[in-house]
Amino acid sequence: MQKLKRAGFTAASFVVILLVMLLLGQAMTPDWRVEPYRDHLRVSTRSTTVASSLGPTTPEGTHPVKEQKISITLAGGVHIQAIVREPSDLKGTGPACLFIHGAGTGKSSEVFGDLASAMASAGITTLVPDKRLDTYTTLHRDYQAMAADYGRSLDRLRSWPGVDPTKVGLYAESEGTWISSIMTAKDTSIAFSILTSPPVYPGRRQMAMAATSYLDLIGAPKGIRNVIPRLMGMDLSLLGLEYADFPSLPYLDQLRMPVMINFGTMDVSMPVEQGAREIIRRTHAIGNDNVTLRYYPTNHQIRTGSRLAKAGLPLEPRYTHNLEDWINAVAMGTKADQWSTPMIAGSQPHQLNQVPRHTNTGLIPSLTALLTLMASGPILLAVALLSALIGALSSHLRARGKDHRQSGFSKGLTGRLWSLGLLAAGLMAALLAYAFTVVRQALGLMHLSSMMASCWSLLSVLCLVLILLLASTLTSVFSRSDGKPAVVGAGHWLTLALTLLGSLAILGSLIFWNILVF
């Protein structure tokens, strides 16, 4: 009967703890999630050719290219290097294009060389400046200040010999499109804006979509996939990262000049359809329908040979030709209804997931709170271990002396506490290792093996074992058949409390990471 009673107490404790953890997981989940994208575009032709009804444009390779390195002075007296590439035999004046870096590039000598040279050979003067890196870090970026810095380069380009200042525009990639959108909002005299692989939406929202898409592609467990809203909704101010909430959309309402949007259909990090629709909708609302959209079967950088962004990959063969034809056609004065090629064309895109409309937080409001929760469990267990060692030393000293007061744990409880602490700590370490492996696989777009998928199920089962062991430990303490106390001595009570609290804190951390979602 006593064994049955103890088994019932253990079962009841297990159910209660499990229900509490499931409710905790529900409370940690925000009121949004990343949904599949369904509002797909249909391109009318696979050809990406750009042509104006006003007449032919200067083709690539027409002019020899002259390259010159210059210095540009930014705010605060900071000097950066820049490279001007221009058609050396151009008569009169012509259009020009300023290049704006995306994330991950900085030196003018290391980026845009093939693009800028090709444009110059088609009669378009180009300027590629260095990115100012003394105010640009992984954790802090001021896009307004960066736009002002690029404005200095724009002024220099407008005053360059052989450049028509009324025909100077921007070419921006990825993160750089946020900067270019600030510039076009503030300076309506910018002649054109080319947006290649633009995130369009604030970084936090775009990254939620991108991270989910990467995890979907590699076959990540549902539990890992569904933790994205919990992470992306957090206050990240502990690290800085204020630029994650850069309000990008209002600037798109000021795109009054001709716009060209380019996406690679193999790029799962960008909203290749949703973002394009957003830009077109906003420009149409202000009366600007001169928006050309092209899709290429390429990666994020419009380069071929790999789905990932890698150094040395070749540009898509038609890409530079289309850019040059479009810029020269815009310089000729081509209006929205004067293009002889479709406004939307290229490879058929298929965006996997939708950028969420908002990114509210759940029960864990900030990165600080999450790190506190995750650190508290191991710290409490470490203190419990220290308490146990001190208790053992104290018992040994009493045994050698004349103090024969008894203290300690009941039979079997010591083993349970050791098992509980070791399993909790081991599970935490295993989960972190698993998450790190999944992230590494996702960044490389390497599909998870069946063994890796099975490991998640194993972690889930071990978490249930941890809950059962916790319930069994509570039974050993509070439901004894012999009526004797399970713990004697303040030090041992402290060790017990620290072990239980540490295990519960780790269990809460595991629940945050959706370990019970198979």
What is each model feature region?
Residues 116-136:
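Conserved alpha/beta-hydrolase
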Residues 156-216:
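Primarily recognizes the serine-hydrolase "nucleophile elbow" in alpha/beta-hydrolase
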Residues 39-92:
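N-terminal cap/lid segment of alpha/beta-hydrolase-fold proteins
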Residues 140-161:
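Alpha/beta-hydrolase active-site loop
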Residues 288, 297-301, 305-422, 428-518:
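Alpha/beta-hydrolase-fold serine-hydrolase catalytic core, especially in secreted/extracellular enzymes
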Residues 92-102:
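Short beta-strand element of the alpha/beta-hydrolase
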Residues 105-116, 131, 273:
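The serine-hydrolase catalytic nucleophile loop
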Residues 255, 261-263, 267:
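Short beta-strand/loop motif that positions the catalytic acidic residue
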